C-alpha cells in the first residue's frame, strides 16, 4: 500500500506495516492486475469540499498513471467513508468504488458503493472454504452485523 511519497513519515494507521513500492506495483500491473486509487493523502472525503475531493482523485490517478503506466479505474474510499457527494464525484473519475461495508457485491450493486470481503475473516481453512459456498452471503451478513456493533461500541 502506498500512502505517501517515498521518504515521508509513516501515517499513524500505517505505522509498522509494509507498503508496496512503485516498482512492485508496476510489476503487478504488468502481470495484469489493476492498481486502484486510495487517494493522495487518505482524508475523510466526506469532510472535504468538491474541489478537495477532485484534487484527491485527480492527484492519485495522475500519480498512478505516471508511475505504473495506466490511470486507476477503481477507488477504495479512505476509511470506507462516502456519501452522495463523494459517490457523484467518483463517477467522474472512476469506473467503480469500494466501501468498507462488509458484504458480497452482486449484479444489482451500486458500482460506486461496492461492499467487499476482507480476507482477514477468511484466514482459517474453515472460513476460507466459505468463499466457494452458497453460505458466503449469510456469513458476510453476520460478520457485517457484528462489525457494526463493534464500531458502535467504540464511540
Model regions and ranges:
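C-terminal active-site subregion of NodB/CE4 polysaccharide deacetylases
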Residues: 30, 47-155
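Generic beta-sheet signal
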Residues: 1-3, 38, 100
Amino acid at each position: 500500500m502506498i500512502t505517501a511519497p517515498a521518504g515521508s513519515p509513516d501515517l499513524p494507521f500505517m505505522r509498522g506495516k509494509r507498503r508496496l513500492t512503485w516498482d512492485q506495483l508496476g510489476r503487478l500491473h504488468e502481470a495484469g492486475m489493476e492498481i486502484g486509487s486510495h487517494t493522495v493523502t487518505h482524508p475523510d472525503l466526506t469532510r472535504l469540499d468538491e474541489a478537495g475531493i477532485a484534487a484527491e482523485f485527480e492527484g492519485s490517478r495522475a500519480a498512478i498513471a505516471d508511475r505504473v503506466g495506466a490511470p486507476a479505474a477503481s477507488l477504495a474510499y479512505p476509511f470506507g467513508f462516502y456519501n452522495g457527494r463523494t459517490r457523484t464525484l467518483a463517477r467522474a473519475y472512476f469506473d467503480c468504488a469500494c466501501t468498507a461495508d462488509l458484504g458480497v457485491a452482486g449484479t444489482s450493486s451500486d458500482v460506486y458503493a461496492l461492499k467487499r470481503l476482507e480476507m482477514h475473516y477468511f484466514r482459517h481453512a474453515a472460513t476460507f472454504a466459505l468463499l466457494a459456498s452458497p453460505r458466503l452471503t449469510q456469513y458476510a451478513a453476520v460478520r457485517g452485523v457484528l462489525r457494526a456493533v463493534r464500531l458502535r461500541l467504540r464511540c
